[in-house]
Amino acid sequence: MKSDRQTDRRALTVLTSSTFSFTVCFAVWMMFAVLGIPVKKMLGLNETQFGLLAAMPVLSGSLVRVPLGIWTDRFGGRIVFFGVMISTVIPVWLIGYATAYWQFLVLGLLLGLAGGCFAVGTPYVARWFPQERRGLAMGIFGAGNSGSAVTKFVAPAIIAAWGWQALPRVFAVAMLATALLFWCFSYTNPAHNVPNTTSFAAQLRVLKDRRVWRYCQYYSVVFGGYVGLALWMTKYYVGQYGFDLGAAALLAACFSLPGGVLRALGGWVSDRHGAYKVTWWVMWVCWVCFFLLSYPPTTMQVQTVDGTVAIDLALSPWVFTALLFVAGTAMAIGKASVFKFIGDEFPDNIGAVSGVVGLAGGLGGFVLPILFGALLDLTGVRSSAFMLLYGTVCVSLVWMHYSFRPQGAAPAPAATVAKAA
């Protein structure tokens, strides 16, 4: 009994320290969402160049997720998580001294390692909890996505007070302090590691399972779309509605905050109602929101008996923000429900599978800001970003419709993965 209480206490401590650390990592990872705006002005970048700048941390953070997930299975989450955080401190600090576009791109790639912490923390946290509580635990950890909102609350104030160069220095100190706190308040359980008799190649055999690629596509929508919009919305408010940086970041946080914090709710709902049903409804909510958000401001000329009447159709900033809030809430729940699939169907390879799925979501978050900028340069229509997202949701709905049996409640067949010896 005493041993069970100690295990529960350690599990709660691991969950708390990991969630806090992931929140800080995500805040650093999303730094260019705000920092990129004064840098864009300073360097005279076009929209596509800004999109590439904002997306560079997402690229590296995505690419490292697979090896980090595998290393977590092999060596344990505590040492890998700590190592990732420590390795980003110097690159983040050096951003404050960058003066050329290529320097920002290179340092952005290096700071992007912070985004790989998700592939470490997910299996690390999940293995401390039984399956019936795993969805909620992973949802609580995933609420660290709210670090994006933290950046939007804190970064404009720091830039206004001390200039943009101060922001990366403050974030570097915060990352160092967080890494040390995590090491002090986390634990290692060797029983959670995949035995050395299981090779990396054996762990990667899950890639032959079609379900993995299905979940990659879903996650590229709910997480990739979230990251892409989190990076883009501050600039969108500035350009579309004329808000200053502080007000634009605050309004953008109305999307980022629920999109992160409510992930825990998604884990709880998925535990109760099943991953399929929750993900299905999430996609439909996103479909409706993106359809409405994609409609550009339009002036219609209507011929009436009294002459020509001009009718302006456009979303006010408040209606726009309300729709973003709903979409962010749905995405938060969807991020947890997709990982509920993984926890249920791949219990022996959570690290490898979550790394692959996280890679797909992260690559979506990398590609989308670049495409947002390219579409804006090509069309001049800011809402083209939502037209693109609307199309990706359509793909998910069609894929879900033809991939699952209608009832969606029957358990999936056993995973074809390498069992730990």
Residue ranges and their predicted role:
Residues 63-102:
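Conserved MFS/SLC helix-loop-helix module at the cytosolic interface between two early adjacent transmembrane helices
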Residues 1-9, 187-216:
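Juxtamembrane intracellular "pre-TM" segments in multi-pass secondary transporters
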Residues 32-33, 210-261:
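Extracytoplasmic gate region of multi-pass secondary transporters
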Residues 140-187:
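Helix-loop-helix hairpin linking two adjacent transmembrane segments in secondary transporters
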Residues 276-338:
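C-terminal transmembrane helical hairpin of 12-TM major facilitator-type secondary transporters
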Residues 107-144:
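Cytoplasmic helix-loop-helix junction between adjacent transmembrane helices
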